[in-house]
């Protein structure tokens, strides 16, 4: 079966490749204790009512039924290693939109499309954990939007790890054809266990000519999670990829969605926020390759660190020799809430073309005690005053999300400020 037939080859690649010598340490991740596959307690279900109560309760806490009532178009819920609930509303399916688990796609009429695109943007040779993903992947989603179709309501997918010492290696493959539009939302969470967990999923997005894709993520993994996810998009002529990313949980994160602007006039927008608390080392950012003329990219991030947390921003902008007339702007603002926390900005630029406009801006600061004093003079407690300031700092990110997800993000920020997320 596709990469599974190459599993031994990919395992050898994984074993032979070195661990990265930059960024956060992953020495605490003992791969000998990671279970690469955990079968859920239920077979595939098409209706919410058919899902067993214990799994249903897990997803209710994630808000899936509520989200469906809000008319979100599709739900794919990954509980440990397989999708156990997947549904696409009839009106979306009637547009010719395909949203299914990737194993079903491999056995259906779109099998050849999956095989043609699977792990082509993120080959197993890309890095050590891409090789591991290629060897042991299971579960995930396949989305295909036909040419000219605009999916007006978001598709969404949830990933939840429930087994201690488990690894989750889901693969999301999204293909949006010429002139089409899609908004895909990914939510991630996991309860806390004493054993380290690993998330090494993969997202591949193909944006057709003059198409537009928005990919939004709210990640709230538990504080024992190593989040080593890989996300990548290829954008054709006149197409647009928009990333909206919120990283709150995990013990360690290395997350840098990459966009390859392959066609003339292709665009990339990245908007992200990272919140690191005690014991967290979150290394996040974005990468872009300008591979065609008149392409543009705009990266805007906010980083927050408290209680000794580390929140680093890492960016990479590459402009190839043929990408004349291209523009790239990178902006990072960091807010440290105490003198024990750390926030660094690590930009990398590889410009191989003269006729381009590239810029980078970074700001690092602390909460103004004068602002806290003013808000307290208006009746707020010190805790509420600081939370309000941090919420205002994050507001440009929140406004890019659908309202229910913006509310969730603001709640996460308030919980993080109180140190009450496990």
Question: PLM ranges: what are they?
Answer:
Residues 1-6, 10:
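Single conserved hydrophobic/aromatic residue that forms the stacking wall/gate
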Residues 85-87, 91-380, 394-422:
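Conserved beta-strand/loop scaffold segments within soluble protein domains that form the structured core
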Residues 7, 27, 48-52, 136, ...:
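Generic structural signal for well-ordered secondary structure
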Residues 19-21, 66, 99, 151, ...:
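Residue-level detector of short coil/turn "hinge" positions at structural boundaries
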Residues 17-95:
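Glycine-rich, N-terminal phosphate-binding loop and its surrounding beta-alpha-beta segment
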């Amino acid at each position: 079966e596709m990469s599974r037939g190459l599993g031994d080859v990919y395992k050898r690649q994984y074993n032979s490749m070195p661990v990265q010598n930059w960024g956060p340490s992953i020495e605490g991740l003992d791969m000998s204790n990671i279970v690469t596959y955990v079968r859920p307690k239920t077979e595939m279900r098409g209706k919410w009512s058919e899902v067993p109560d214990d799994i249903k309760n897990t997803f209710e806490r994630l808000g899936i039924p509520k989200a469906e009532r809000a008319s979100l178009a599709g739900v794919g819920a990954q509980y440990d290693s397989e999708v156990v609930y997947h549904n696409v509303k009839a009106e979306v399916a009637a547009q010719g939109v395909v949203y299914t688990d990737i194993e079903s796609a491999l056995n259906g009429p779109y099998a050849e499309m999956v095989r043609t695109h699977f792990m082509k943007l993120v080959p197993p040779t890309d890095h050590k954990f891409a090789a591991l993903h290629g060897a042991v992947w299971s579960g995930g989603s396949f989305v295909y939007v036909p040419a000219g179709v605009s999916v007006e309501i978001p598709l969404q997918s949830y990933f939840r790890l429930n087994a201690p010492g488990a690894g989750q290696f889901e693969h999301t493959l999204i293909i949006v054809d010429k002139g089409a539009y899609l908004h895909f939302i990914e939510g991630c969470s996991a309860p806390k266990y004493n054993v380290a967990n690993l998330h090494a999923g993969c997202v591949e997005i193909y944006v057709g000519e003059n198409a537009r894709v928005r990919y939004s993520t709210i990640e709230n993994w538990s504080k024992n999670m190593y989040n080593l996810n890989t996300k990548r998009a290829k954008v054709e002529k006149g197409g647009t990829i928009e990333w909206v990313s919120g990283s709150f949980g995990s013990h360690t994160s290395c997350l840098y969605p990459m966009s390859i602007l392959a066609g003339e006039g292709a665009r990339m927008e990245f908007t992200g926020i990272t919140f690191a608390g005690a014991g967290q080392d979150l290394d996040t950012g974005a990468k872009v390759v300008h591979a065609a003329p008149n392409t543009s990219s705009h990266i805007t991030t906010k980083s927050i660190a408290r209680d000794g947390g580390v929140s680093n921003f890492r960016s990479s902008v590459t402009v190839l020799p043929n990408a004349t007339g291209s523009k790239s702007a990178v902006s990072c603002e960091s807010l440290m809430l105490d003198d024990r926390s750390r926030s660094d900005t690590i930009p990398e630029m590889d410009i191989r073309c003269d006729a381009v406009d590239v810029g980078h801006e970074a700001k690092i600061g602390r909460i103004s005690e004068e602002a806290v004093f003013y808000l307290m003079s208006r009746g707020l407690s010190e805790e509420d005053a600081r939370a309000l300031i941090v919420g205002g700092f994050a507001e440009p990110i929140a406004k890019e999300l659908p309202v229910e997800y913006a509310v969730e993000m603001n709640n996460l920020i308030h919980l993080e400020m109180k140190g009450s997320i496990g």
